[in-house]
Every structure is written in structure tokens, then in C-alpha cells.
Amino acid sequence: MVSWIICKAVVLVFGMLYPAYFSYKAVRTKNVKEYVRWMMYWIVFALYTVTEAIADLTLSWFPLYYELKIAFVVWLLSPYTRGASLLYRKFLHPLLSSKEKEIDDYIVQAKEKGYETMVHFGKQGLNLAANAAVTAAVKGQGAITERLRSFSMHDLTAVQGDETSENRPFATFPDGQKKARASVSDSSGFGSLRKDSGDDNTDEDVEVNSEDEVYTQKGLRRSQSMRSVKVIKGRKEIRYASLKHKPKKRPQLYFREDTAHHL
């Protein structure tokens, strides 16, 4: 682990930062000799980076592997050995010169195929995204319909009943109390009818001796009958066949001459 950390630090500092600074100076001073030297170094270092990535996966178990990497970077960079210039002139330049045309063709084909591949995979990605969105929408709609079907009509009526009971301004009576009240009102109306009929019978039996008493009794009888009619109209009318009453004809009143003379 310590060897890996030291190796990584040496490669970053001496293999990248130091050459980058001197490459800047070569470009600024327009020194062609130094410019060519550092260009050859960067070509060799790029090849070294690719080889290092493969070797770290396959040869990292080898003894003194990281120490050998440090020594190789120093050998490439040292002005005394000039390892980068040596590798480039002896191996890389002849190889690249012989394979230059093939490499250019591969690059052009890679660009064309890369564009077509990108468009193809882009279309597939859009189709997959659209299908996923439609599937999610259909599943969501199906879940909502199943949820609505799970409710029975009894549950819906119960919910409506709860809402109407909450919105009522006053409490309602149950059906039993309504029937009891209706029976009480009917019985009271029936009692008033019997009372009125009894009053009529007693009025018929009484003999009237004066015209003033006749008018006063008629007014009382009319007021009682009107009150009974109002009570019956305000409540539920119930007809009873056995309670039909036929009023008797009142006897005609004859006034004597003596009483008229006194009046």
C-alpha cells in the first residue's frame, strides 16, 4: 500500500507536472528543439499510461512492481538517459509511419459508426422511456379503477348518509318517534271531533229564550268549529266512517207578542 502511494505521487509530480511546465516554456520561447523533445515525451507517456492501466490489473502482484514503475518514469524523464526520445525514434516512429493510413481509416469509420450508433441507441432509449411512461400510466389507471370497484354500494350510501347528517342544521327523529307523534296527533284530532260533536248535541238540547243568546251561541259554535277545522287541516286528516255526524235541524223560534212588546 505504501509503495502504491509513493509510486502514484512520483508519477504525478515527475511524470506529469514537471514535463507540463517545461512544455509551456518551450511553447512560450518558441524553442523548436525543446518543443520536439517534449512532444516525443508526451507521445511515449500516453502509451505508458495505457500500458500501466493493463499492467495494474495483471502484473501488480509481481515483486517490486511499483518500484520498477518509478524507475521507468525517471528513465523517461532524465536528461542524461533521454529514454522518451530513444523509445520514440527506435520503436514508435517506425511503427506509426507504417500504420498511419490504416489508423486514419479506423478513425474515420469510428466517427461514422459512432454517430450512427449514438443515434440508434438514442432512439431505443427514447422508445424505452415512452413505453415505460405508458406502462406506468396504464398501471396507475388500473389501480385506481380497482380501488373504486372495491367500494360497494352500501359503503357509498353510508358515506352519503354521513355527509347529509353532518350538513343538517337540526337533528331528525327516528321513524318510531315519527309514528308515535303521528298517532298522538291523530288521537288528539279525534278527541277534538268528539268534543265538538258533544258540544253540538248539548247546544241542540238547550232551549233558547232570546235572540241575543242565539247569536252569542252561534258565534261560539262557529269559533269552536273553525278552531277544530284549523287543527285538523294543520295535521294529517284521517277519515273515520263511524264518526259521520248528521246535524239535526234546529227548531224554528217564534217570539211571542208580549215579549216583543216588552222589548
Curated annotation (Swiss-Prot):
Keywords: Cell cycle, Cell division, Endoplasmic reticulum, Membrane, Microtubule, Mitosis, Transmembrane, Transmembrane helix. It is found in: Endoplasmic reticulum membrane. GO terms for biological process: cell division; endoplasmic reticulum tubular network organization; mitotic nuclear membrane reassembly; nuclear envelope organization. GO terms for cellular component: cytoplasmic microtubule; endoplasmic reticulum membrane; endoplasmic reticulum tubular network. It comes from the Eukaryota. It is a multi-pass membrane protein. InterPro entries: TB2_DP1_HVA22. The keyword Cell cycle applies. The chain crosses the membrane at residues 2-22, 35-55. GO terms for molecular function: microtubule binding. Residues 242-251 have a biased composition (Basic residues). Residues 199-214 have a biased composition (Acidic residues). Residues 161-228, 240-263 are annotated as: Disordered. PANTHER family: HVA22-LIKE PROTEINS, RECEPTOR EXPRESSION-ENHANCING PROTEIN 3. Belongs to the DP1 family. Microtubule-binding protein required to ensure proper cell division and nuclear envelope reassembly by sequestering the endoplasmic reticulum away from chromosomes during mitosis. Probably acts by clearing the endoplasmic reticulum membrane from metaphase chromosomes. This is Receptor expression-enhancing protein 3-A. The gene is reep3-a.
